[in-house]
């Protein structure tokens, strides 16, 4: 779960690493936070893609059904 605090902490560690540098503990913490963050983002993307995939499938079935019901009248 990505929390506001987690984001703030990642930002804080990033800026500190750019300015004065991090201690070994902070480097470890930064690595853990980033892994957690990336894992969460990947999960979200996967869920998004799955819901989009299912939505598309049902739309296609819908579309195909409608085509069967249309009778083309030739003049």
Swiss-Prot record:
InterPro entries registered for this protein in UniProt: DUF896 (IPR009242)
Keyword Cytoplasm: yes
Keywords per UniProt: Cytoplasm
Source organism, top-level taxon: Bacteria
One GO cellular component term: cytoplasm
Localization per Swiss-Prot or TrEMBL: Cytoplasm
Transport in keyword set: no
Family named by the database record: Belongs to the UPF0291 family.
Entry protein name: UPF0291 protein Teth39_0326
Species this chain originates from: Thermoanaerobacter pseudethanolicus (strain ATCC 33223 / 39E)
């Amino acid at each position: 779960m990505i929390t506001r605090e987690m984001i703030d902490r990642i930002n804080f560690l990033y800026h500190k690493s750019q300015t004065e540098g991090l201690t070994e503990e902070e480097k470890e913490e930064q690595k853990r936070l980033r892994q957690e963050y990336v894992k969460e983002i990947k999960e979200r993307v996967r869920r998004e893609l799955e819901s989009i995939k299912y939505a598309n499938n049902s739309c296609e079935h819908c579309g195909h059904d409608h085509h069967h019901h249309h009778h083309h009248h030739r003049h």
